[in-house]
Swiss-Prot record:
It comes from the Eukaryota. It comes from Homo sapiens (Human). Keywords: Membrane, Transmembrane, Transmembrane helix. This is Transmembrane protein 69. GO terms for cellular component: membrane; mitochondrion.
Length: 247
């Protein structure tokens, strides 16, 4: 650095020596002399003393990337890589969980499908569907307990997690109590599934994303199947055996 300053001061002193009054009467020889002086002291090519004095700095600066930062592009790529909704994580579900979930939807979908095909309302099938839905609510409450109990789980075994897991159980119990009025019992099961869905996805968001996607699919299909059963009951004639305990 000192050598660079010394060289620059020498060049400045040489320029001062060649300070000519450039004007209209300046001779061509004087202008050429000034031009040669500037070329000798400020050559566009790199000087050997400069490259020998700073070999490390030259090599380091040549490896640097000098293009401007593009934070907007990086943010846009991150936003594009992120899925738009929770349902997109359904493909990330483990195969056993996906197969068991699809098999578990059969008791929800089969009764209204049979009644639609026969165009009759069969009480025993409707009761079977309602009983399965109420049992499924108890299963959802047990999932929360099982998720909160292991050590190191993101869901701690506190009052919020454990007490909220009992909410679906109460809807299930009440649905069996009023099973004599099957339509009201089905509506109770639908309400319980909605409450469980709200607790798991919004108030207690500790489950994996693929499990949330499965819960969305199960809740929508189960609710839709229950609604079809209620429509069939009000639209088609009743036929078949009465449910157990019904006169």
């Amino acid at each position: 650095m000192l050598r660079f300053i010394q060289k620059f001061s020498q060049a400045s002193s040489k320029i001062l020596k060649y300070s000519f009054p450039v004007g209209l009467r300046t001779s061509r020889t004087d202008i050429l002399s000034l031009k040669m002086s500037l070329q000798q002291n400020f050559s566009p090519c790199p000087r050997p003393w400069l490259s020998s004095s700073f070999p490390a700095y030259m090599s380091k600066t040549q490896c640097y990337h000098t293009s401007p930062c593009s934070f907007k592009k990086q943010q846009k790529q991150a936003l594009l890589a992120r899925p738009s909704s929770t349902i997109t994580y359904l493909t990330d579900s483990p195969k056993p969980a996906l197969c068991v979930t699809l098999a578990g939807l059969i008791p929800f979908v089969a009764p209204p499908l049979v009644m639609l095909m026969t165009k009759t309302y069969i009480p025993i099938l409707a009761f079977t569907q309602m009983a399965y839905g109420a049992s499924f609510l108890s299963f959802l409450g047990g999932i929360r307990w099982g998720f909160a109990l292991p050590e190191g789980s993101p869901a701690k075994p506190d009052y919020l997690n454990l007490a909220s897991s009992a909410a679906p159980l109460f809807f299930s119990w009440f649905a069996f109590l009023i099973s004599e009025r099957l339509s009201e019992a089905i509506v109770t099961v639908i309400m319980g599934m909605g409450v469980a869905f709200h607790l798991e996805l919004f108030l207690l968001p500790h489950y994996p994303n693929w499990f949330k996607a499965l819960r969305i699919v199960v809740t929508l299909l189960a609710t839709f199947s229950f609604i079809i059963t209620l429509v069939v009951k009000s639209s088609f004639p009743e036929k078949g055996h009465k449910r157990p305990g019904q006169v």
